[in-house]
Amino acid sequence: GISDGETSDFSLDNKYALESGIYIANQQTVSDKISLQYGLRISMFNYMGPGSAFEYFDDVTPGLRRGVASEEEFGRWETIQQYINPEPRFSIKYQVNKSASIKASYNRMVQYIHLISNTSASNPLDVWTPSTNNIRPMKADQIALGYFKNFKENAYEASVEVYYKNIIDLVDYIDGADLLINRFLEGDLLAGDGRAYGA
């Protein structure tokens, strides 16, 4: 015979956030050979209720989840945490001749949504989470330098470019972190700095 099966429904509370921003930019020709582009974006991110916000103990023991120090309930539309960040960008172009140019640029980028990915487990798992009172937005400063060459009256372009990126508050997790249906996921997360470079 067939026995009645039992099922359990596990789910986590939804998280709510609102992101907004303004951006201004300008393009300026300095001379026949030099042109500039520059701008500024101001982004604002609000992590909001309804929901619970946790505060964790500051002490970090390698490989162990931080303990919950307190829990506070927030109502609908109440701001739990707010972040405001300037994101400047600047680029300069030097026209070597009609078909070749050199470009240099700087960008500050801020990311408020984080992908917590565990690809080493037997069942790969991706978890998306917004920036919260415990997870700061990730910031990246990138500089780049490139040489660009057009061919056949600008029908084709070839280029080589090098870049360096410095990353602040890069999110990672402790060894043995529980990413699946974990109400206290933030206690398993770490923030660090990183860098990337290439061509």
List where the protein language model places each region.
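Signature of Gram-negative outer-membrane beta-barrel scaffolds
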Residues: 1-97
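Extracellular loop and loop/strand-boundary signature of outer-membrane beta-barrel proteins
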Residues: 5-12, 25, 72-78, 127-133, ...
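Membrane-embedded beta-barrel scaffold of Gram-negative outer-membrane proteins
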Residues: 95, 101-113, 117, 134-197
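Hydrophobic, lipid-facing positions within transmembrane beta-strands of outer-membrane proteins
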Residues: 18-24, 86-90, 131, 141-145, ...
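Flexible coil/linker segments and helix-coil junctions enriched in charged and small residues
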Residues: 60-66, 189-191, 199
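Flexible, surface-exposed loop regions and adjacent strand-edge segments
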Residues: 1-8, 52-64, 117-127, 174-184
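Tryptophan-centered motif/residue detector
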Residues: 41, 45, 127-131, 173
